[in-house]
Amino acid sequence: MDELIVDFNNLDSNLSIDDAKKYLQNLISRDKAIEINLKQHIKLKDDLEIQMESFDNEIPEYLTLSLKKSNELNNRISSTCQLAENLSSKVKKLDNIRERIKDTLKKVDDIIDLKNCIEGVQISIEKEDYEGAAFHINRYLSIDKSVLEDNSSEKLSIAEKKLLSMIESKYQQSLQDNDQKQVLRFCILYVPLEKPLEGIDKYCNYLKNQSKKLDAMITHYRNYIQSPKTIKPISAVSVITKIFEHFAAIIEDDLPIIKSEFGVLHCPHFILNITQQCDYYSSKVYDSFNDQFQTNKNVNDILVYKQQLEKSQQSIQDSGSGSGGGGGKVSEKIDPRNFAQFLDETSMISKATKFYEKYLIRKEHLIKSDIYQYYSKLEKEKIEKLNSIKSLIITNSRNQQLQQLPQPQQLQQQQQYQQQLQTQENKENELLKKLTQEKDKQMKQTIYSNVTKQKMNQLLGNYILLEEYFMVESVNKAIQMDSLQSLDFENNINSSNSNSSSVSGSGIGGSNTLSSSNSQQSQQSTDNTMIDFIFFVLQKSLQRAIDSHSIQTLNVICNRLCRILSQTRDNLKRIFREYIIRSSSKSVMDYQSSLQVLNNLETSSEYIIRLKKEFDSKCLKIYPIYKLDEKSKDLESSSTSSTSIEQQQQQQQQQQQQQQQQQQQQQQQQQQQEQQQENEFESNLKDDIIIIRNLLNLELKKKQENDRDQVNILSNEFLNCSKSFNKILQEEIESLFKSVQPRLKNVLNQFTLVNYEINQLEYDNNDINDPFVLQFTLEISHFFKPFQEHLSNTNYDYLVHQTIQFILKKIEGITIQQKKFTLLGGLQFGKDLRAISTYFTKISQSTIRDKFSKLNQISSFLILESISEVEDHWNENRNSPTWKLSSSEVQKILMTRIDFNHDQILKLKFN
């Protein structure tokens, strides 16, 4: 079309005829095209007009039909809603009528039951059918009080009292006959009479009568305390153990009966009653035990003695500072051996008490687990009932929303029904809350009596005080006896030295007479006895603390024991220093006493390690290692899967069918949710029961793990104490060696006088007449002799190493700074080093090769034939990890070779 359009403004005035014809033809084609388009539009207009006329005729008919259908549907829906409202109101009326009928029938049944109860009780009492009479009384107690008449209530109350009187009479008769079966029968009758605790008390009273045989045993024990020579011996340990075994057997045998006949909720009352009976007998034993050993008197005397001792020490300190007078009077010490038996038996009594307590804890966990399960079932029932009430509330509220303009009477009825449901829901919520509170209360309370535990703790408090006194005084007594015997020993030594000739020389002790040798053996035996006695006492005390099975007692005793060991270590250190000072002030130095102190330090360290091993092995049995199970902390919770509702029907176009389908879906979803909630609750109930059991076990395991941690801490204390003894031992050996270092001056002087600027003749002569090594070994042997005689092997070896290190250090300095060597002198120096090393290797228990490494390296440079070999030798060895010489030291060593040119030495490059 665009091609047919001609712009006349662009036509040229000089247009040719052919071009004009061409343009004319284009105009004709354009007109034809426009005419065709015009005809098409006219035809389209006609079609539209025809369609519009058709719509004007048909649309009103369709609209009228749709309006009619809509009105019919509206009428149907309205009638359906009205019918639903009427039906709902009638159903509610029927529900109310049904409830009233139920109440009426219940009252009728109660009246009939009341009549039967009155007749049945009288007949059962006449026949002495106590179980039947109790059943009728139980039924009477459960009847609604509103149907009871005064006359009927009075008759049944009289019958109840009469029945209780008869049961009491029969119970007393069975008690006298010691017939457990009949006693249990009449005690169980209190359960239907709604007096289960009274029944349990009566049964426990019977068990108490069965325990009277324990009175005879306690009487025997008391008589033995008063007349130990004429009465058959019996200990408090055996008495208390039999008491615990007796009552544990009662719990083990009768608890299942109480659980099945009286209910699990009354098991705690039974346990409490039995443990109170046990407390009665155990308290008698504890009191008699204290009377037997006069515990209170000993404790008071020790406290008074400690107070007087502190005042006396304070007075002495004040007197020393010039601010007070002399020390006050201190009462006589109590011999710790007087209550050694008390300590032994207290430990065993504590062990028996701990076993009894652990047994009660295990029973408590089992009972609480059953109680938790019982309350969980009740909670489940309450929750199910509460869910049903909530479902009714939701349904009623939905029906109210679907109703259109309900009548006032119907609206009022619906509101009343809704209020009833709300009231019932609140009531059930209160009951559920109360039930949960009762469960929590039952789970938190302790179901057994703690009097026995309290009595034992009081006894352990006295035990700890007496045990501390026993350890301290026994150790002090051993040290005092050792001091007295040491003074006697020194007097003997002085007297023997005055009768013997003193020998001068480089030795320490000089020559010893036979009497002095005997005195030395006596002193060594005395010191060993002191250490043995101290650790025997500490071992005994530690053993008692472990056997008590009380981690608190063990903790206190171990801490006190470690303090005593620390004091013993400090005393040994002080004594050693005093001996060193005394020995240094004498003309002939005698280190025997100080050497024995060093041996005592070593022996003490070994004893402590032995105590630690014994402590670890025994505590591992009593306080085993527990690893907390992660499954007990995080339990797998079972999850219930819910299947979605498959929609099988196709969606309908009509609104009524859609509403029906939605209602069906909502009902199905509600049922499915209720089923899912029930499954979840059952699963959660099982999980909760597992959880509460695991939590109780977890609590016990945590306590045991804490006890184990305390044991590990105490074990480390022993290890640290042993290390402190070893540290002091090394320090004092080093101190001892420093005090005797001047005695090695002659040995070092011999090396200073040795000439290493020798020729071949002198070198060969040295093989025949050794100028240094032989005399050196003799002097060293003489130096070591008293130490070897009196020191232990370990201490002696440590002193040897100290001596070797000192001598070699001095030889190293003399070699570099004072000596001059020829090649043969260097070879001689190497031979001397090997001879000295061989000698020291023989007298030493551990390797000494590393101590000679630097001197051997010095010797390796002294035997080089020429300076040209130095750099090669240096490069071969300088990267070795054991190489100890620096380049400057190597130059100094080479300078000692008289045959080497100093300028050439200085030109050496040590890269």
UniProtKB/Swiss-Prot annotation:
Classification via Gene3D superfamilies: 1.20.58.1970, ESAT-6-like (1.10.287.1060)
Entries under InterPro entries matching the protein: COG4, COG4_C, COG4_M, COG4_N
UniProt KW Membrane keyword: yes
Gene Ontology BP terms: protein transport
Pfam families referenced in this protein's UniProt entry, alphabetically: COG4_C (PF20662), COG4_m (PF08318), COG4_N (PF20663)
Membrane topology designation: Peripheral membrane protein
Cellular compartment(s): Golgi apparatus membrane
Alphabetic keyword roster: Golgi apparatus, Membrane, Protein transport, Transport
Keyword Protein transport (UniProt): yes
Any GO CC annotation of this UniProt entry: Golgi membrane
Quaternary structure (record): Component of the conserved oligomeric Golgi complex which is composed of eight different subunits and is required for normal Golgi morphology and localization.
Role, per record: Required for normal Golgi function.
Family named by the database record: Belongs to the COG4 family.
PANTHER family given in the database record: CONSERVED OLIGOMERIC GOLGI COMPLEX SUBUNIT 4
Name of the protein: Conserved oligomeric Golgi complex subunit 4
Lineage of producing organism: Eukaryota, Amoebozoa, Evosea, Eumycetozoa, Dictyostelia
